[in-house]
Each structure stands twice: as structure tokens, then as C-alpha cells.
């Protein structure tokens, strides 16, 4: 590899790449500085005027469920240096960075991991043929001849390949189709989370960055959705540079690569990965510099906005009226002829899979709570409630149980519309809807937790507890139905705008864009940082199509075809005290109701200091969300689970459950039991805390560089394969069985 890079990436070419990258970054960062003032003004105006959106009925977690392991297990990884397949112990922590260890024993001994992979921008491929086709298309002229050895050979029929257009690729395989499906769901969850790298609560920096990306690409005549808007700001910036730099390098270096087609493909992957990380480091330094600069002047900008808010609004409205008078006739004709006829078909294509997915979320939540209720009746009441509720609290982050919800969106098709509206891929809409599903599931679970915790304060008996769970479930489902409708309608409106606005801007650009500079004189110089002609122009274009979009969504709600509430149905203060309950400390179900005999407080004989110490110890525990219920790989030793016990609970209450908790739609086909000990292996206790050296500052290292550091604490700022600095976490067990120390080689 070193010879390839030294040959094709010598000092002169590296200097050229750095200069080209710097030029692109300088141009983009000017857009970012311009958009920062606009985003700051919009944020402060939003705080004063409000959103106008319906009030959510469900609660949301203010303290996230950190310190958990989403998944752990074994899989084979292809080693590029030795060209061999090795068995690796892998786990996914709460930040969704895939961590690969030599084996489980290495993990328990806190040996540094082999790799930490941030999967933003990656795609999962489930066949070698798919991969070879993509590789052949990425570097023309390198398609291998029939019968020749491909770039990759998989020893089983169940591969999983992580493919990225610029960074290195990762090759895994499993022994069974069931394992492949399981890991595909887990890795897809990692990609979904890592792609959503810009924080949702970023009200200024986030919108400023995404608007700057859009404005920069439009300045290059690139409209429509962009698949590589994935990851955090630095990763997205790196993708932006590579979008322009990659084809240039490919044209220069492609003809110079030597060897068979497979070898040239391998060389190009190595070169592209090296360039990508050069760009990443340069983009990171430049972006942090500019971000620090705009944040330093933010207080002064806020002072101007607070003082002159009314004048800024008046000036912007005056500018908008002038632009509207100029473009409205052209925009209305364009909307009427090219957009309006297609809105119903686009909306229908979006509504069907999205509504099916949200219905599945409701069904999964219903079944999990119902199963928990039956388990409470049959197996110990409040004594087991803490264990069951801890599992339920993590339901939204269980990739396998949520998979039936997510996969509904995979049927989304915009056939015939993608080319017309320049929609390169539907993946951006699929992932956005899936993120909404996870959020609504977590909101429903958290609201259920909060209401049930209030009921438990009354000291109910087992029968009363069952009825309380039923009543709380019914309340939460009503709130979920309302919030689900609101979230879906907002998603439909945003998706329709995301499809139609770039199309309209592209259509209007030849006749309108060149005339925009003359409107600049209408903006007072003092307000020029908060009002931009381009942004105001886009808002006017948006308004011309917005009324048609709102009308289409309103008509869909009136039809009640997809269980959408009408806009006139508003639930005001249906639970006025509910939001007050959410202001308290997070509920620790394991602490309050684990073997407490129904009591929610520590034993009187337990010293307070010991209780606090126990809480601190528990806070460090890494709890696996996913408990492996299937047979392990052939090289694993899995203990057999006892056969499920036959429920013998209270007949009357079971009848109540059957009558009162029947969902409107059929439950999922697969078993989704929560808290049934017969179906899940018991979770082992955490190993005692081991002494470890003081943690060093977290280092963001480049992919592919092995560094002997401590156990991983993956960062969302990473890109590709990385290894993190030592952490003070103890070695903790997860629930997936594996054979520690086994090295299997094909």
C-alpha cells in the first residue's frame, strides 16, 4: 500500500490536493458566514413568535439513555493486509460506532480494539456481485474479465459489505442467513444514526451549515437532493470537496494505475481513502477556525437583532414584496404546469409506506407493553417490574424489534418522478421517516414510564397494577395517534418542499437569478448580515407552492385514508399536569423496583453512602439492549434456554387485556416479547471495576491507523475506522454469547 501511495500521491500532488481543497473550503465557508447571520436572526425571531405547530402530547427524554451497548456478537472480517478472514468480537455502543475487538477476551481485558468505524455515508451491500458492479462503475475500464479472480472472495453465501464512494470499504460475512439479517439491521441502524450527525437541537449552526451547503451547490448548478449530506459537519464538508476533487483525480490517476483490473481497483480504493482523509483533516481545521470566528461575534449580532428586530422584519418584508412582484407571474405558471399536477402522486407515494411504518410502531409498542403486563401477572408483580421496565425503556433503540417498522419505508418508490424532479435517491426520505419513527417510539415509551411511575406511588396490588398498566397504555396510545398524525403531516410537507423547491429554482434560474443583484440596494447596510437576497428569493418561491402542498395534505387528512387527524382537531392541555411530571429526575427502574418487594425506596438498613456508591457503580454499567435469542455461530458455545413457561395468571385480568387492548391493526407476525425470561438469556452481572490508568484526552485519529490505546470511547466526530483513547470504564459483560479467544481462519 505504501508503494502505491508514494507513487501516485507524491509531495507535488499532495500540495495540489491541499490547494484545491483550500480553494473549495474558502468558497464554501464564505457561504457559511453569510448564512450564520440569517440563521441567528431566524432563531431569535422564532423564539419570540413561536412555531405555530400543534403542541405535542407525548413527553420526550431530556436525559438521553447513554452508557448502553446496542448490540454485541461475533462476525468474520476480511483483513486486507493478510487477505484472510478473521473472527472478531464486535459491539455497538450508544453512539453507534462499530467497535471491533480481536475477541471477547480482549474486550473484557480492556485491550485496545482493532478498529472503531463511523459508518456515516456508507451503504450496506448483501452480495459480492453488487459490490463488484459498484467497483467497476467507480473506475471505468477496470471491469474484470469473465472467469478471472474478483477483488473479493467471500467464504460464505452471507456477506455484508460497507461501501463508501470515497473512504475505505469493510468486508464482513456470517455463517447463516439469520445472522446476516440480524447484523444488517444493526449496521443499518448505525448508518442511520451516524448519517444524522448534525444535532437536532442546533438552532443556529445546523441550519446555517445545511443552507450554506445548498447555496454552494446551487452556485455550481447542482440542484435537487444530495445523497452525501451524511454525518457531522466535517464529514459533509469532506464529501463536498471530494464530489469535485474525486473526478479530477480519477481522470488523472486512473490511466496510470498498473496491473490487472482487480489490482487497479484495489489501488484506487487505497488512493481515494488516503485523499479523503487528507481532505478531512484540512476541512476539520478550517471549519473549526471559522466556527470559532462566528461564535465570537455572535453576542454583538444578537444585541443588534434584539434592538432592531422590528426594523429588520419590516425591511425583509419590503424586500420580499419587491421580489414577489418580479417573480410571481413566472413562478405561478411554473408551479401550475410542472409541479401542481404531480403533488397528489408524490404525496400518495410518501404516505403509504410512512403510515404503515408508524402503524407498525404503534403495534410493536402495544405488544411489548401487553406482554410485559402478562409477565407481571404471572411472574412476580412489582418485584419483576424494574427488570421489565428497564428493557422496555430501550425499545426504541432495539434494532431488531424496530426493524419491522423501519422496513416499511423500504417500499418507498418515486418511479417516474425522480428524474423529473432531479431526486437522485429516496434514501434521504426513508432515513428521515425512520428517525421520526424511533423518536415517536421513544416518546411513547417515556410517556408510559412517567405515567406508570406516578401510578406506582399509590402502592397498587398485583391486580391493580395490571389495570393501571392497561389504563396508562390506552392514554399513551391516544397521545401517540395524535402526535403521529402531526409528525407525519409535517414530514409530508417537508418532503414535498424538498422535492419541488430545487426543481422550481432550477426552472426559474435562467430568467430570474441574473436579476437578483439589483434588489441588494433595498437592504439597509446595518441589516445586511441578517437579510440576504438569495434567501428571501427562495422564501418567495416556497410561498408560491406552499398553498398547493398544504391543500394536498389537508385533503389527505379529510379522507382519513392513512389515519391522519384533520387540522381542526387540536388537543389542548389534554393532560395539563403531564409535562410537570417530566421535570423530575430520570426514573431508574432497576434501582427502585429491582427485588424491592414492591417498595420504591432503599432498605432502611442500607447506609446512604452505600446507596450513592451503588448508584454510581450502576451508572457506569454498559447494558446490552439486544439480547441474542438465536443460536450462535457454529464456533460459539451457546447455553440452551429453558422452554417457555405456560402462563397461569389471573384469568379475569387476562380477559380484560384481550378485550381492552386490542389494536386497530394486526400485530407483528414475529414474536416481540419483552421481559419474558424464557425467551431471553439472563443478563450477566457486570465485572468488578478494574483499576486503570488516568484517561487521556480523546484523540480523533485517522482511519486505518492502529494505535495501542485503551478501551474505546467512540466519538461521533470520527470518520471511518478509528481507535480512541483510554477510558475509565470497567470491563463489562454483554448478553451475547461467544467463544472468547477463538481465531477462525478460512
Curated annotation (Swiss-Prot):
It comes from the Eukaryota. One of its GO terms (molecular function) is transcription coactivator activity. Residues 590-746 are annotated as: Disordered. Residues 68-192 form the PH domain. The modification Phosphothreonine is found at residue 606. The modification Phosphoserine is found at residues 568, 574, 601, 603, 609, 624, 638, 641, 646, 665, 681, 692, 696. One of its GO terms (biological process) is positive regulation of DNA-templated transcription. It is found in: Cytoplasm, Cytosol; Cell junction, Adherens junction; Membrane. This is Protein Niban 2. Belongs to the Niban family. It comes from Homo sapiens (Human). Keywords: Cell junction, Cytoplasm, Lipoprotein, Membrane, Myristate, Phosphoprotein. Residues 720-746 have a biased composition (Polar residues). It is a lipid-anchor. A lipid is attached at residue 2 (N-myristoyl glycine). Changing residue 696 to A: Loss of melanoma cell invasion. Signal peptide: none annotated.
